[in-house]
Amino acid sequence: KLAYVALDYEQELETSKSSSSQEKNYELPDGQVITVGAERFRCAEVLFQPSLIGMEAAGIHETTYNSIMKCDVDIRKDLYGNIVLSGGSTMFPGIADRMSKEITALAPSSMKIKVVAPPERKYSVWIGGSILASLSTFQQMWIAKTEYEESGPSIVHRKCF
């Protein structure tokens, strides 16, 4: 309700130290009112800088860039121009602008970057999985509990790849 993604994290952090402009009051279920300041944007920053919580992982912008760069050079332009955010973690206000800024900084300067954040993206992962599961070709990849118990994880490779 109060969290957002900062377009410029360092600048937002500096501003929060010298001003209370980002502070918002929030009423807890028990009626207690708390003031939330820099936490509003610091929590979402972990998506871009996992090192803030001690994780050695690339941020979502770097992961997106690396994924595009592993694809055939002929389709990269289309991929850069069609980055679609999906899932509940993309519901933070400001995430599309920040992704666009970060991908633009990583991508070749000639690339046109377009990041789309559809309003229904919170459920798009579920919708996609549901469509996939309903395809007749997908049913041959289903794994019964007994099959998994007999073969272990290797059954996934045999049936799905």
From Swiss-Prot:
Pfam families in UniProt: Actin
Enzyme class: hydrolase
Signal peptide as annotated in the record: none
Keyword Cytoplasm belongs to the record: yes
Molecular function as annotated in GO: ATP binding; hydrolase activity
InterPro entries, per the entry: Actin, Actin_CS, ATPase_NBD
Primary localization class, coarse: cytoplasm
Keywords: ATP-binding, Cytoplasm, Cytoskeleton, Hydrolase, Nucleotide-binding
GO CC terms, sorted: cytoplasm; cytoskeleton
EC number in record: 3.6.4.-
Compartments where located: Cytoplasm, Cytoskeleton
Matches recorded under SMART domains: ACTIN
Catalyzed reactions per annotation: ATP + H2O = ADP + phosphate + H(+)
Cytoplasm as UniProt keyword: yes
PROSITE patterns: ACTINS_2
UniProt function note: Actins are highly conserved proteins that are involved in various types of cell motility and are ubiquitously expressed in all eukaryotic cells.
Record family assignment: Belongs to the actin family.
Protein name stated in the entry: Actin
Organism: Pinus contorta
Lineage of origin: Eukaryota, Viridiplantae, Streptophyta, Embryophyta, Tracheophyta
